[in-house]
């Protein structure tokens, strides 16, 4: 089975079907942003389209008109790079829709791929709602889900979430090992995920955590008390075993009141000197350095699907216009 072929121009589309397609990163950086951009760019070039990378998100477009025509060599090594080579931030197009429309028209964009998480979804929604005021936004636009939180509406998988889980497994295993070495220590680990408990739930499952706190299942005094009683029972039965370290997982948005530090303090107070607690916050380390193999595979599939959607949308429009012209004639 061949996974590549010579660039012999056999896949080039007719000149009238070639498009200018913009690619932009929106939101927090995550693994596989670059891999998806590379896949979309290479697909576009193989078909004769012109891919434009919008640099530094919508703020870069609005302030500086930062668009760059992407070539083969520009994205050649992007498949294994984390972060965002184009640059990304949380700025939304609503900050200056007029400037966004101006640059879209200036570069004659005929399709847009927005890669990111919930902010990317929000940006797509804003552009769609502004179509009546800015006709250029009537082009086909897609949101390619890419966020460690895996919380983009209407999607089942987001790029970067698998890489995040792999990083957290190693992190939590190291934390639990430290807790075990101290025999009587509990770690409360705070993980990212926004308002989705996906990351916290999976990490709690694969690392053997005693409790997991997510936004979907709110923390209250009763549940916390039950978890502490379970913790006491576990320590009572361990009798100083060398694997007696314990761990709680808390999503960053699980509660505004019961913070990671507060939960750790409550556990320490309940221990009455029999066991102690610590907090561990991996922070932006969770975004990972290099995308996992799964994220890389999905990045290619998602990138190509986005391009195919834009192609099919424009083909449908051309066919409809052709029919109207023929009827008029």
Predicted feature residues:
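Short glycine/serine/threonine-rich phosphate/pyrophosphate-binding segments
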Residues: 30-40, 61-62, 94-98, 118-126, ...
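Short, ordered loop/turn segments at secondary-structure junctions
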Residues: 26-28, 49, 54-59, 90-91, ...
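Glycine/threonine-rich beta-strand-loop-alpha-helix active-site module
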Residues: 41-70, 125, 129-175
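Short glycine-rich or small-residue beta-strand-to-loop segments that form or flank ligand, phosphate
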Residues: 20-30, 84-87, 110-116, 187-190, ...
């Amino acid at each position: 089975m061949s996974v590549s072929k010579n660039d012999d121009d056999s896949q080039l589309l007719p000149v009238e079907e070639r498009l200018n397609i913009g690619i932009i990163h929106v939101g927090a950086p995550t693994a596989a942003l670059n891999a998806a951009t590379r896949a979309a760019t290479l697909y576009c070039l193989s078909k004769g389209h012109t891919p434009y990378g919008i640099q530094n998100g919508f703020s870069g477009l609005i302030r500086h008109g930062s668009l760059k025509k992407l070539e083969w060599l520009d994205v050649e090594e992007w498949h294994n790079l984390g972060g965002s080579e184009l640059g990304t931030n949380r700025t939304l197009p609503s900050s200056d829709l007029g400037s966004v429309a101006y640059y879209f028209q200036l570069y004659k964009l005929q399709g847009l791929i927005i890669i990111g998480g919930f902010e990317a979804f929000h940006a797509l929604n804003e552009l769609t709602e502004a179509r009546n005021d800015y006709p250029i936004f009537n082009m086909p636009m897609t949101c390619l889900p890419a966020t460690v939180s895996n919380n983009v509406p209407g999607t089942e998988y987001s790029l970067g979430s698998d890489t995040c889980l792999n990083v957290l497994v190693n992190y939590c295993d190291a934390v639990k090992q430290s807790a075990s070495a101290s025999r009587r220590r509990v770690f409360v680990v705070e993980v990212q995920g926004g308002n989705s408990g996906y990351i916290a739930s999976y990490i709690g499952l694969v690392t053997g955590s005693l409790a997991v706190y997510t936004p979907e299942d709110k923390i209250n005094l009763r549940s916390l008390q039950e978890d502490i009683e379970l913790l006491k029972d576990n320590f009572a039965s361990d009798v100083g075993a060398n694997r007696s370290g314990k761990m709680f997982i808390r999503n960053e948005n699980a509660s505004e009141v019961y913070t990671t530090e507060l939960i750790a303090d409550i556990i320490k107070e309940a221990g009455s000197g029999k066991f102690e607690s610590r907090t561990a916050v991996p922070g932006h380390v969770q975004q990972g350095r290099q995308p996992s193999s799964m994220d890389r595979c999905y990045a290619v599939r998602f990138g190509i699907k986005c391009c195919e959607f834009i192609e099919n949308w424009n083909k449908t429009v051309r066919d409809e216009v052709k029919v109207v012209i023929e009827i008029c004639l």
